[in-house]
Amino acid sequence: YHMKSTDELINDLKKQDQTSFLENETDYVQSGGAYLSKLLKEHHLQPGNLIRDLELERSYAYQILRGTRKPTRILLLRIGFYLQLSLSEFQRMLSICQRAILYPRNRFDAAIIYALEHNMSIDDLNDLLEEIGEPPLR
């Protein structure tokens, strides 16, 4: 299975009429759950690793991975740190999961971007968040 690039998808969309768009709409949209499952696979992790290491409620985690529940933005940020994603990977994950991307003019988000760019651990990030009066990632 060949995953089309964004440019290929845009070119396809330009050429399609409404009927063919409606028939093929699922080719363009990836669910948050499917994307998170793919990220776990790419990092050679099982859902059980994520559940244990992030101390998630088992059924909630599986509902997220199946796409029947949307993860909170905080949970996505925790998952991103757990998987050691880059800033661009974080933004993509947040966008696909329909959550606000990190915005540098927001103090909380700026601290997260800083932590990412300086390879800080989640514990160090939580200390930094506490120092600036923001809630920790828990």
PLM feature spans:
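Short, charged recognition helix plus adjacent turn
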Residues: 1-2, 10, 91-120
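A short, Lys/Arg-rich alpha-helix, primarily the initiator
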Residues: 12-46, 125-138
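The alpha-helix within a helix-turn-helix
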Residues: 40, 51, 80
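Short alpha-helical "recognition helix" segments of helix-turn-helix
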Residues: 46-53
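Key DNA-contact positions within bacterial/archaeal DNA-binding proteins
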Residues: 48, 59, 88
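Recognition helix of helix-turn-helix/homeodomain-like DNA-binding domains
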Residues: 55-71, 96-98
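Short, basic-rich loop-to-helix N-cap that marks the start of a DNA-contacting helix
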Residues: 68-80
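Long, compositionally biased
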Residues: 81-83, 107-136
